[in-house]
Amino acid sequence: MKTGALTTFLALCLPVTVFATTLRLSNEVDLLVLDGKKVSSSLLRGAESIELENGPHQLVFRVEKTIRLPGNEERLYISPPLVISFDTQLINQVNFQLPRLENEREASHFNAAPRLALLDGDAMPIPVKLDILAITSTAKVVDYEIETERYNKSAKRASLPQFATMMADDSTLLSDVSELDTVPPQSQTLTEQRLKYWFRLADPQTRHHFLQWAEKQPPS
């Protein structure tokens, strides 16, 4: 897809639905999956927030933070993947509140019994269900989307069954053939649909930065 066409395509993807909840992102949180869908890290890189519809949501993420070691050394701490589910029906903003994580002892405690809070726009706690996402795959590269689907089918603490089958068949994401001048390979069409989905969720500033980047890309 040529850059100009890509820009027009994304501009037309702006949602007609008015989103009512802003999820404020944290530079210490690596978002992996949102509501059963793998997060497009390239599109959300540098984004400050994501716009969500009111209702139930589920995040899969890792906490990443530099911690101190003895001898004034430092290392990057990366937590196990965590699952958190919550409802934004009457909430207009969601903010992460992480516990103190400054050293190996605190990191070990967090690994064993993770705890964190989500706060609304008035800094009031949002009811959440938090769990560790146990990885069943032995592959070097983990498909967190598939692992999340398994988790949601297992009736665990933070499971949301409505997100268990959303990604079971990628064909459900494909647009009607009438929207396309020609029928591209399924993988290409799916890539466009995923890009469209994450573009819709990105905040206006991130959309603007992405469109600026897209304009500078050479035509394929």
From Swiss-Prot:
| InterPro entries recorded | UPF0319
Q: Name one Pfam family in it.
A: DUF2057
Signal peptide boundaries: 1-20
UniProt keyword list: Signal
Q: Which family does it belong to?
A: Belongs to the UPF0319 family.
Kindly give the HAMAP family that the UniProt entry links to this protein: UPF0319
According to UniProt, the name of this protein is: UPF0319 protein YccT
Q: Which species expresses this protein natively?
A: Salmonella schwarzengrund (strain CVM19633)
